[in-house]
Design a protein with these regions (language model features):
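Glycine-rich phosphate/adenosyl-contacting loop at the front of the ribokinase-like
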Residues: 1-65, 76, 319
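Cofactor-binding loop segments of dinucleotide-utilizing enzymes, especially the Rossmann-like FAD-
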Residues: 8, 68-72, 106-108, 117, ...
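Hydrophobic anchor at the start of a short beta-strand
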Residues: 3, 63-64, 88, 171, ...
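Conserved phosphate-binding/catalytic region of the ribokinase-like
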Residues: 212-319
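Gly/Ala-rich phosphate-binding loop of Rossmann-like dinucleotide-binding domains
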Residues: 58, 165, 272
Length: 319
């Protein structure tokens, strides 16, 4: 079964400042702030929610289809997806734009200053779910039977949710950092046409505030509500009960960037393969735990056999 992954493709440029921002910023002069930080180290990572989710689903042996927009600078990313054998045929290139990118500077106290340029992501609405449906109906691998709408351009997120619903494709609504772009009634409209909803605990609180509904009430509007809680695992609200998903202690904590996307890759694989929520949630939890031990969102490279072995070690049964 193929999964259509709607969301962002982005570059993350990460720089390290060998000092503390606080030593360079004078509070009494904040109104005329003009600072420059020398950053001796810099690296560029492949990122973006759609790219990260697809990467993790691919590790598990799933069949991700990415639907996203990139800029004229996307050649390295597209080459990488080709090497990984991830379906990138529905990634649209906007030549006059840059691929979305985050430029992150971290100081020695782990404070961060981030600049985000959405670039081509703002044109995500140009992509149409119907085009994927038409193409995959003729593809030997078969049609997309599951989807996810992850953070992307606002109009793209809105339209892709409605297009998936109209196509009869069950999907996860994963608003993430895009959640503040929607008001309460808009969020409820998207939730009501989604099959599943995935948020972290902070986003869950914001969702409750904006909609005026408790998470339990929100859960009544979807087949399942998944709330991730970082090192505390996750809760799955389903069939009027809450399934607690235990965390998988990480061997070491290196970088949390992309852990939520790794979790969602596990969710999609479990749903693709008809697993129960106890198993699906545990697999998703494990994927997040594996990711956090590596720098960057797409640098962990476990084999499917290694993932299976770690799952059995952690939970005492196989998926």
């Amino acid at each position: 079964m193929a999964s259509l992954i709607c969301g962002s493709i982005a570059y993350d440029t990460i720089m390290n400042f060998e000092g503390k921002f606080a030593d360079q910023i004078l509070p009494e002069q904040i109104h005329i702030l003009n600072v420059a930080f020398l950053v001796p180290t810099m690296r560029r990572e492949f990122g973006g929610c759609a790219g990260n989710i697809a990467y993790n689903l691919n590790l598990l042996g799933g069949d991700p289809i990415i639907m996203a927009t990139v800029g004229g600078d996307a050649a390295p990313y597209m080459s990488r997806l080709e090497q990984l054998k991830i379906d990138a045929s529905h990634i649209r290139q906007i030549d006059q734009a840059f691929t979305a990118q985050a430029m992150i500077t971290t100081d020695q106290a782990n404070n961060q200053i981030t600049a985000f340029h959405p670039g081509a992501m703002g044109e995500s609405h140009l992509n149409q779910v119907s085009a994927v449906v038409a193409e995959r109906s003729k593809n030997a691998k078969g049609p997309a039977k599951l989807g996810i709408v992850a953070p992307d351009g606002r109009q793209g997120m809105w339209e892709h949710c409605h297009q998936l619903a109209e196509a009869g494709i069950p999907f996860i609504f994963d608003p993430g950092q895009g959640l503040p772009m929607f008001n309460g009634p808009e969020l409820l409209e998207l939730i009501d046409i989604a099959s599943y909803l995935a948020v972290n605990d902070y986003e869950g609180e914001m969702l409750s505030q904006r909609t005026g509904l408790s998470l339990a009430k929100v859960a009544e509007r979807v087949k399942a509500l998944i709330v991730t809680k970082g090192a505390e695992g996750a809760d799955v609200y389903v069939d009027g009960k809450v399934v607690a998903i235990p965390p998988v202690p990480a061997a070491k904590v290196v970088d949390p960037t992309g852990c939520g996307d790794a979790f969602r890759g596990g969710l999609l694989f479990g749903l693709e393969n008809g697993m129960d929520w106890e198993t699906t949630g545990r697999l998703a939890s494990l994927m997040g735990s594996i990711k956090i031990t590596h720098q960057g969102p797409q640098n962990h490279q476990p084999s499917k056999d290694q993932i299976s072995a770690q799952f059995k070690t952690a939970f005492g049964f196989s998926f």
